[in-house]
From Swiss-Prot:
Catalytic activity: a carboxylic ester + H2O = an alcohol + a carboxylate + H(+)
InterPro entries documented for this protein: AB_hydrolase_3, AB_hydrolase_fold, Carboxylest/Gibb_receptor, Lipase_GDXG_put_SER_AS
Organism: Arabidopsis thaliana (Mouse-ear cress)
Active site residues per record: S176, D276, H303
EC number: 3.1.1.1
Gene3D superfamilies: alpha/beta hydrolase
PROSITE patterns cross-referenced by the UniProt entry: LIPASE_GDXG_SER
Family recorded in the similarity comment: Belongs to the 'GDXG' lipolytic enzyme family.
Record field: compositional bias (Polar residues): 7-19
Protein name per the record: Probable carboxylesterase 6
Gene Ontology terms for molecular function: carboxylesterase activity
GO biological process, one term: cellular response to hypoxia
UniProt entry tagged with the keyword tRNA-binding: no
Length: 336
């Protein structure tokens, strides 16, 4: 799609309360839902076209997945050299975070992070711009993820970038709500039919899970108003994204246990942030599954540090995480 920007941006209007009635749910500064169902999103983070500096060694373009649902993806493809072009590269299918309700594959923070991930890990990356709740409550995002994989299955022989891709080595990845989506998509593809590709593993960065009973890390971090994710915002994201009438005991709020022991998805990397209210739920999903799950705890950093953190610690830890993901994909010890 070249430089075409496919994302839709909704801006705020101070008169909306008069037109659409009172606000019935919101996450301050990010999203408001009005009584008549109108949804207003604030664009706090800039959206960018699919362009990258030449020196990064990665090309970028947007592709349409489904015209009817307006689902699209941003592709990052490492530039080949004479030395590297002999072997094909793994593919990471990535789902952005945002509580299922906000976010875009064109957000600058994701664009920069995934370009670095592609360059560092020597992988193609496909960042999926899925449908958002509350207009499209779950499982819409899960369905879009599955459709993105089915699109890959059809596109593998029709695109120049596909010639560089090893479709036998696909990793489903995402952060926060995107980590939840990645695992749900993997579960839905646990018994694939007519797929000429293989999901080798999942990479879950601070995956978004919850429950009605509060965890210790939720009580410890959840009321920190400086945190990216608070208890108030976490609860609001779930209210706006779950099927009508569901609470936080719904299966969508829990890790998919069947996929952890799946014979088709053989490996999982879980990246946990110490200062994240999700820490306990992320650690718990790994307990007893050490044979198939590699758990990495990033100390001193909070939720979404890898895309929103501005401190030197966040920057250094992001570099470490990129190295850990690279090591997980390519089977080596990052400390050696």
């Amino acid at each position: 799609m070249g430089g075409t920007k496919l994302t839709h941006v909704t801006t705020t209007n101070p008169n909306n309360s008069n037109i659409h009635g009172p606000v019935v749910d919101e996450v301050e500064g990010l999203i408001k839902v009005y009584k008549d169902g109108h949804v207003e999103r604030s664009q706090l983070l800039p959206c960018v076209d699919p362009s990258l500096p030449l020196e990064l060694g990665v090309t970028c373009s947007d592709v349409v997945i489904d015209k009817l649902t307006n689902v699209w993806a941003r592709l990052y493809v490492p530039m080949t050299t004479t030395k590297s072009s002999v072997s094909k590269l793994p593919l990471i299918v990535y789902f952005h975070g945002g509580g299922f309700c906000v976010g875009s594959a064109s957000w600058l923070c994701y664009h920069e992070f995934l370009a670095r991930l592609s360059a560092r890990s020597r992988c193609l990356v496909m960042s999926v711009n899925y449908r958002l709740a509350p207009e499209n409550p779950l499982p819409a995002a899960y369905e879009d993820g599955v459709n993105a994989i089915l699109w890959l299955n059809k596109a593998r022989n029709d695109n120049l970038w596909a010639k560089q891709c090893d479709f036998g080595r696909i990793f489903l990845a995402g952060d926060s709500a995107g980590g939840n989506i990645a695992q749900q998509v993997a579960a839905r593809l646990a018994s694939p039919e007519d797929l000429a590709l293989k999901i080798e593993g999942t990479i879950l960065i601070q995956p978004f899970y919850s429950g009605e009973e509060r965890t210790e890390s939720e009580r410890r971090v959840g009321n920190d108003k400086t945190a990216v994710l608070t208890l108030a915002s976490s609860d609001a994201w779930w209210r706006m994204s779950l099927p009508r009438g569901a609470n936080r005991e719904h299966p969508y709020c829990k890790p998919v246990k069947m996929i952890i022991k799946s014979s088709t998805v053989t490996r999982t990397l879980v990246c946990v942030a110490e200062m994240d209210l999700l820490m306990d739920s992320n650690m718990e999903m790994c307990d007893g599954n050490e044979d198939v799950i590699k758990r990495v705890l990033h100390k001193g950093v909070g939720h979404a540090f890898h895309i929103l953190g501005k401190s030197q610690l966040a920057h250094t830890t992001t570099l470490e995480m990129l190295c850990q993901i690279d090591a997980f994909i390519h089977h080596y010890d990052p400390l050696n």
